Amino acid sequence: MSVKKKLFIETLGCAMNVRDSEHIIAELSQKENYEVTNIIEDADLILINTCSVREKPVHKLFSEVGTYEKAKKKGAKIGVCGCTASHLGSEVFKRAPYVDFVLGARNISKITTALNTPKFVSVDINHDESEYAFGDFRSSPYKSFVNIMIGCDKKCTYCIVPQTRGDEISIPKDIILKEVRKAASSGAKEIFLLGQNVNNYGKRFSGTHEKIDFSDLLNLISEVDGVERIRFTSPHPLHMDDKFLKEFSTNPKICKSMHMPLQSGSNEILKAMKRGYTKEWFLDRALKLREICSDVTISTDIIVAFPGESDRDFADTMSVVESIKFEQMFSFKYSSRPLTPAASMTNQVNSDIASRRLSTLQARHTEILDEIVKAQKNSIHEVYFEELRANSSVAGRTFNNFLVQTNGSEELLGKILKVKITDPKRMVLYGQII
């Protein structure tokens, strides 16, 4: 039996990148005899699967790749994949000439070709359905990430994703259901559906396929034997119609946590961002969700200091935060991305003002979070345990996405058990199994 080669892979960015990395691992394992290592010095191949949503991950790429070049063993190859690869293409070689190949986010199915072709570059965006068929690998035996669509049509003025991942294309339901059945039959109780705008699923396919919407897809997945929990990211506020909210609130297998990316609470800024909805629409959908699904948790994304944002615009964002009281918030200062309309807007906000606004927003959300967490004391949740932690403890998620940790061993992994919360903290709720 031949000796397996070693693969070191670093994944930056979103859950879709995590799933892409899983596909890469499977392809290299099945076709090139690789296995994963966590030791860079042992690796025959070093891959960085990149993110380009903000500027910071791009800088991190070239910092990391330089470190890897110094640490790698003689003869090892370095590849750059993902969204930054899509954006920069062969420019990566100019900035890091020791990189051996570059694969865009829509080209990872070509990983074996790239590995065996000197200075290979592929960043084209096409709609070939053969690219949906990958080898199978899951980084967790307890849940499975499943892509249901690729690309994005929204063209938000600050976002580079449509340029790196292409137009929005839905993956045919038969392919999705086949992957779900396979994951569930191998023990994955939780299915995590991925897409840039999942609740716009079914609007466009690359070929002739049965037209179904996201609500119908959720229903079909919930009927698969072995599936006990369904999560998804990210839905778009524009497509949160009543049918979708009803399916979300009434389907007993859909986890009651919703990500609603606000970005801004100002109608003027939302218009400049080309988000497609108003503050009023967002509030209506979020408050309706709270009404029909009392145990729901809502998370959000917020960008402060988008070009042209005034004090009043920022106050509008703060007012939405006060109204909805998000259980989780991912907030950032606006990051200018090349080739996006917002990058050329003349009314950029001073960086000191941006920093103050972000601090104000995050400080208030911390206060809100403290109130939310405090209310969890003595509550009882069903927790799906997925992770071993230090000091003989295990961690998992509640049905509405709180992270819970309790005393326990490996035998609890993969089980759903009731836990009483005894010591709630901001980042994790500590409890006891009952």
From Swiss-Prot:
Keywords: 4Fe-4S, Cytoplasm, Iron, Iron-sulfur, Metal-binding, S-adenosyl-L-methionine, Transferase, tRNA processing
Top-level lineage group: Bacteria
Binding-site residues for [4Fe-4S] cluster 1, renumbered to this chain: C14, C51, C83
InterPro entries according to UniProt: Elp3/MiaA/NifB-like_rSAM, Methylthiotransferase, Methylthiotransferase_CS, Methylthiotransferase_N, Methylthiotransferase_N_sf, MiaB_methiolase, rSAM, rSAM_horseshoe
NCBIfam families associated with the record: miaB-methiolase, MiaB/RimO family radical SAM methylthiotransferase
Function recorded in the entry: Catalyzes the methylthiolation of N6-(dimethylallyl)adenosine (i(6)A), leading to the formation of 2-methylthio-N6-(dimethylallyl)adenosine (ms(2)i(6)A) at position 37 in tRNAs that read codons beginning with uridine.
Protein name in UniProt: tRNA-2-methylthio-N(6)-dimethylallyladenosine synthase
Species name: Campylobacter fetus subsp. fetus (strain 82-40)
